[in-house]
A protein has these predicted regions:
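Short regulatory helix/loop adjacent to the ATP-binding pocket of P-loop NTPases
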Residues: 144-160, 176-177
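Hydrophobic anchor at the beta1->P-loop junction of P-loop NTPases
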Residues: 27
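Structural recognition of the conserved hydrophobic beta-strand(s) that form the central parallel beta-sheet
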Residues: 94, 136-142, 163
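Interdomain hinge/linker elements that couple catalytic modules in large macromolecular machines
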Residues: 5, 163-276
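Conserved Walker B catalytic segment
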Residues: 99-138
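Conserved lysine of the Walker
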Residues: 35-36
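Short glycine-rich substrate-engagement loop in P-loop NTPases that contacts/grips substrate
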Residues: 58-89
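Pre-Walker A adenine-sensing motif
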Residues: 2-22
Length: 276
């Protein structure tokens, strides 16, 4: 991304208001919408300006190689114990892509309950550290892997979700400036994903958005829900996008697609796509 500052005042103020409230702050949203930038850049800058010492800000990025070992729940727990002990004042813990903290899958076929337990052990870690008076927890996670329903259940009412969306036009225009009509046309065409600012050509922007779409709707969803009919998922999404703004329902989709999928299966596919 270019060295331009993108303001996300609405979300930043929500983090500021929630500071030190005893809740786990969960910053969620679709991939690449600016969750990490909000937490590790804008909010961190705010804390430093408020006088928080750098050593009192613990930063973990579980999608990066340098922190890969912390994807193991036991390793993450031990690291947090060590990095928060013996410090004066509040310790602010930032964990990027928290859903990557999970035990590796074994060789035998696991039940849905076993899969959920293996993938959600990080909740126990966060719940324990949330209760420590000198620790303030902030985590990020993608919608396709970290559902609001999971958060509400696992944190027992002590988790606060901040849903981050791509840039609004006002945020977009504040960053790009120039002729407002031209900016509006570009925004309508390509949307408000922050990383588009680093791309100079239309071809690069199209390729980026196509790749992002495939990652979100196919790799993430197919992986999380272990779908075996991703071909039909693609067809359902094609129909939905071509009929944007029109009313539809599972019966109409089934009739239009002419597939062997029934209404119940199409309804399930609609549910998982809306989760993103």
């Amino acid at each position: 991304m270019r060295t331009m500052k993108i303001k996300r005042d609405f979300y930043l103020n929500r983090l500021i208001d929630a500071k030190g409230d005893g809740f786990v702050k969960i910053v969620t949203g679709i991939r690449r919408c600016g969750k990490s930038y909000l937490l590790f850049n804008l909010f961190k800058t705010h804390l430093l300006k408020e006088g928080v010492h750098r050593e009192n800000i613990v930063e973990i990025a579980l999608d990066r190689k340098k922190d890969a070992k912390l994807r193991d729940p036991d390793a993450l727990y031990d690291f947090l114990v060590h990095s928060t002990a013996g410090k004066r004042g509040m310790v602010y813990v930032f964990i990027d892509e928290i859903q990557e903290c999970r035990r590796p899958k074994g060789t035998r076929r696991e039940t849905p309950e076993e899969k959920a337990e293996r993938e959600q052990q990080f909740y126990d870690i966060l719940n324990e550290f949330r209760q420590r008076k000198n620790v303030d927890l902030y985590v990020t996670g993608s919608n396709s892997r970290l559902l609001v329903t999971d958060v509400a259940t696992q944190f027992r009412g002590r988790g606060e979700t901040i849903q981050v969306n791509p840039l609004t036009f006002s945020e977009y225009y504040a960053a790009v400036g120039g002729d407002k009509s031209d900016a509006w046309s570009r925004y309508l065409l390509y949307g408000g994903m922050p990383e588009l600012f680093s791309m100079r050509t239309d071809a690069a922007k199209r390729a980026y958005l196509e790749g992002l779409f495939k990652t979100i709707y196919f790799r993430d969803i197919v992986d999380r829900y272990e779908l075996h009919d991703d071909y039909f998922l693609a067809n359902v999404n094609d129909v939905l996008m071509s009929a944007s703004g029109s009313l539809t329902n599972p019966t109409k989709l089934a009739n239009h697609l002419g597939t062997v999928l029934g209404k119940s299966r199409i309804r399930a596919l609609l549910a998982v796509t809306s989760a993103c």
